[in-house]
Amino acid sequence: MSQIHSFIPSNASPATLGISLILCGFIVYSVSKMFGYRTNHFPVEGRTIVVTGGSDGMGKAVACQLAEKGANVVIVARTVQKLREALEAIKGTAQDVKKQRFHYISADLTDAAECERVIAEVTEWNHGLAPDVVWCCAGYCEPGFFVETPVNTLRSQMDTVYWTAANTAHATLKSWLAPIPPSQQVPLPQRHLIFTCSTLAFVSIAGYAPYSPAKAAIRSLADTLSQEIEVYNGARAASSRNAAPPADVKIHTIFPMGILSPGFDNEQGLKPQLTKELEAADKPQRPIEVAKASIQGLEKGDYLITTMFVGHMMKASALGASPRNSIITDTLTSWLSSLVFLQVIPDLRKKAFNWGLKNGVPSSQSK
């Protein structure tokens, strides 16, 4: 302890220490962004990738960028016409359309049996091999005050946000983790299961009561799976193993903020005015920007991936027991965010109080 104290001036004030900490956080964050990474932990060329919710918005942008990098892409959504149109756009971005393969599947992912059908169909289409990557992008947001929202909407949001992801993950992992005997085991690259969450899972905002809990549930599921998956990875690593899964698996979660899309336009029409005021700092990104930042995070090997600096600060404020991307960067940024959110959280509550003081009890007329 004496060595640590020797680095701290005896007359340093709390303000000085706080400013120094903030500067350190910004320096570490900037350096990490400047120098990036050397190893690509997410090579996709020649690999088969399933993107749910791939007919528009972020999912479509993700599929296009993966195709541009040489992946074989399967998109999943409900509406056949939108899937057909999206698939043509995805083919148009392909690195080599003659070598790559593309497919779409219409399915209702709130039904677990449909998710199992999707994985089975992709496996058959992929010459009997399970997909290498499954990226869960399905879901939409219906904002509103909790008491003003019908209970069936609360349930619907859990179905379309959480259960589409959980059902897809369950079907995928059942396929990936089925043990095979040593005689059938061949070297396979690491597989990736990717969830798409929201920064609202870190810091929720009034008006997102139907949506935020479902996203928080995804984050919790991903954290749990990041531990459970190591049981299967460990079984593969055993020197005297018997039956084991055919490949290691890694879990990732993406945390975008606002995304400019048809779904966002619909969301804005439902959103309480208070919510719009509280999230004024959230500058929506284009789907292509979110997809690019997400893929860059995957290529770095990150577990929790945010797509802009504000989201990074929100993540740092709520790391909890989640695995860190970088012990040093995440720790310093969490110290910085703890100072920032000493101001932010009371400010959000104060604005909500003042909004009620001015507008009265929320109702459908206040939207």
UniProtKB/Swiss-Prot annotation:
The keyword Plastid does not apply. The chain crosses the membrane at residues 12-32, 193-213. NADP(+) binds at residues 211, 215, 259. Its EC number is 1.1.1.102. It is found in: Endoplasmic reticulum membrane. GO terms for molecular function: 3-dehydrosphinganine reductase activity; NADPH binding. Pathway: Lipid metabolism; sphingolipid metabolism. A motif (GXSXG) lies at residues 53-57. InterPro entries: KDSR-like, NAD(P)-bd_dom_sf, SDR_fam. Pfam families: adh_short. It comes from the Eukaryota. It is a multi-pass membrane protein. One of its GO terms (biological process) is 3-keto-sphinganine metabolic process. Its main location: endoplasmic reticulum. The active site is at 211 (proton acceptor), 215 (lowers pka of active site tyr). NADPH binds at residues 53, 55, 57, 78, 82, 108-109. GO terms for cellular component: endoplasmic reticulum membrane. Catalyzes the reduction of 3'-oxosphinganine (3-ketodihydrosphingosine/KDS) to sphinganine (dihydrosphingosine/DHS), the second step of de novo sphingolipid biosynthesis. Belongs to the short-chain dehydrogenases/reductases (SDR) family. This is 3-ketodihydrosphingosine reductase ksrA. It comes from Aspergillus fumigatus (strain ATCC MYA-4609 / CBS 101355 / FGSC A1100 / Af293).
